[in-house]
Amino acid sequence: MTTNYIFVTGGVVSSLGKGIAAASLAAILEARGLNVTIMKLDPYINVDPGTMSPIQHGEVFVTEDGAETDLDLGHYERFIRTKMSRRNNFTTGRIYSDVLRKERRGDYLGATVQVIPHITNAIKERVLEGGEGHDVVLVEIGGTVGDIESLPFLEAIRQLAVDIGREHALFMHLTLVPYLAAAGEVKTKPTQHSVKELLSIGIQPDILICRSDRAVPANERAKIALFCNVPEKAVISMKDVDSIYKIPGLLKSQGLDDYICKRFSLNCPEANLSEWEQVIYEEANPAGEVTIGMVGKYIELPDAYKSVIEALKHGGLKNRVTVNIKLIDSQDVETRGVEILKDLDAILIPGGFGYRGVEGKIATARYARENNIPYLGICLGMQVALIEFARNVAGMDNANSTEFVPDCKYPVVALITEWRDEDGNVEVRSEKSDLGGTMRLGAQQCQLSDDSLVRQLYGASTIVERHRHRYEVNNMLLKQIEAAGLRVAGRSGDDQLVEIIEVPNHPWFVACQFHPEFTSTPRDGHPLFAGFVKAANEHQKRQAK
């Protein structure tokens, strides 16, 4: 089986939407029956984004196999059926780390280790490994052509195109075509200079995707084709749209998939985009709207919650309602009070780390519980809901997490290495013990209680969801909380760890330790988000009576 590669680069400015363009093209090719995957090569020196600030980098997307990756992999999974893994994302830091380990082991037999060939060879090896078993692999290069950080990756893909043969390699370059209101026309010069920069590295683009706030006229596309040495039919206009899910249809309408299949000599049927047409129809024709408050600590950069925001929109699609998301800083709840939570149809508290804003989240969970407002807590959102219930219902004054108050009287949430048994002895666990280390990452099984709301929502007794956390519900203090009325609706496959809690005498109060947003897609949605948005819609109707 021969694997074909499409290398995706960006020019002029960053944030042009290379990830969306690559994912949209992959969706079209998948709709033609091809086995497609996407890779992201990030030029930063961090080994992975796991320890990077969400405010600076955006969310960390967790794959099934537990890799902490770039948020673009979330876009990839929302557009195609193929699941991403740690083989789909690697960074400069990871490449250099691997090469340096080999050098220390003597794998290079005393050779002088250099960017070329050692770093570029390592990059090529990982691209080829990630592409095994697929018809087409799209490889997105992070950053912008001209950045010094990207040079080893660009050199590697230049070499790789020669290695595998140009008949199996395409270079697709995204570039900005700005509109100047004063001149009343779009300008192609930035694109010409961007392609010139790419040519200086030794890469001739085969396809140009022209990003603009409007459709790029045919005469301007012809001009770009002439000056950039690209066929006119390979100069594609990608204008701004009100929904990213319109991009596959936009690219297909200009024959991009036909051009690629012809270049790769792929004989495959026409793409059937009916599923995407249905998504677009549902998005454009809602029967109502709801307002959901998301109370977090990284709200100045919405991309920090990208998958949650998208999952809420997917929940809206499944209920034919538009979801308006109100981002609320949890510190504002602390300083201004819960009054700022009024007029919401539902409340969601997403994941997070650190003490800042936690008391505001706890107050938010209490407000939702006491006022019968639909509540969905994710990761930390479950932990604060548990702390709130322990304090205000179970009589455990000052209950907390050891993440925030290490010596609290009631550590209802703690590292699994900090649990104490019924005799008060610290339970010692390590990365070699059955429960693993202190960080749970990736897909794990969860058993649902038969009498739970989530059992009805999922329609199954066993589910698999992705995790990213260090702290767990402290089982040694759980009995007192359950006796006060909290329901444990889901436990880990070994029945050891609390995965889902519910408040039974509440219209809709669900909190989970895992991250359901990572498996929500526009075509399929997710049971928790669909149920949550439905509850928000019902709450709105009750309030209107």
From Swiss-Prot:
NCBIfam families assigned: PRK05380.1 (NF003792), PyrG (TIGR00337)
Q: Where does CTP bind?
A: 14, 147-149, 187-192, 223
Question: Which positions does UniProt annotate for ATP binding?
Answer: 15-20, 72, 239-241
- Please give the activity regulation comment for this entry: Allosterically activated by GTP, when glutamine is the substrate; GTP has no effect on the reaction when ammonia is the substrate. The allosteric effector GTP functions by stabilizing the protein conformation that binds the tetrahedral intermediate(s) formed during glutamine hydrolysis. Inhibited by the product CTP, via allosteric rather than competitive inhibition.
Q: Name one Pfam family in it.
A: CTP_synth_N
Instruction: Give me the ranges of the annotated region Amidoligase domain.
Output: 2-266
For this UniProt record, the keywords arranged alphabetically read as follows: ATP-binding, Glutamine amidotransferase, Ligase, Magnesium, Metal-binding, Nucleotide-binding, Pyrimidine biosynthesis
**What role is this protein assigned?**
Catalyzes the ATP-dependent amination of UTP to CTP with either L-glutamine or ammonia as the source of nitrogen. Regulates intracellular CTP levels through interactions with the four ribonucleotide triphosphates.
Q: Which residues bind UTP?
A: 14, 187-192, 223
Gene that codes for this? pyrG
Something else the entry says is: CTPSs have evolved a hybrid strategy for distinguishing between UTP and CTP. The overlapping regions of the product feedback inhibitory and substrate sites recognize a common feature in both compounds, the triphosphate moiety. To differentiate isosteric substrate and product pyrimidine rings, an additional pocket far from the expected kinase/ligase catalytic site, specifically recognizes the cytosine and ribose portions of the product inhibitor.
Instruction: Give the EC number(s) listed in the UniProt record.
Output: 6.3.4.2
Q: What is this protein called?
A: CTP synthase
Domain Glutamine amidotransferase type-1 residues, every copy = 291-542
Q: Quote the InterPro entries the UniProt record gives.
A: Class_I_gatase-like, CTP_synthase, CTP_synthase_N, GATASE, GATase1_CTP_Synthase, P-loop_NTPase
Known catalysed reaction(s)?
UTP + L-glutamine + ATP + H2O = CTP + L-glutamate + ADP + phosphate + 2 H(+); L-glutamine + H2O = L-glutamate + NH4(+); UTP + NH4(+) + ATP = CTP + ADP + phosphate + 2 H(+)
Query: Which of this chain's residues are annotated to bind Mg(2+)?
Result: 72, 140
> What's the family?
Belongs to the CTP synthase family.
What GO annotations for molecular function exist for this entry?
A: ATP binding; CTP synthase activity; glutaminase activity; identical protein binding; metal ion binding
- Assembly and partners? Homotetramer.
Active site residues according to the UniProt entry: 379, 515, 517
- Please give the pathway this protein is involved in: Pyrimidine metabolism; CTP biosynthesis via de novo pathway; CTP from UDP: step 2/2
Family matches, as PANTHER family = CTP SYNTHASE, CTP SYNTHASE-RELATED
Binding sites annotated in the UniProt record for L-glutamine: 352, 380-383, 403, 470
Enzyme superclass (EC): ligase
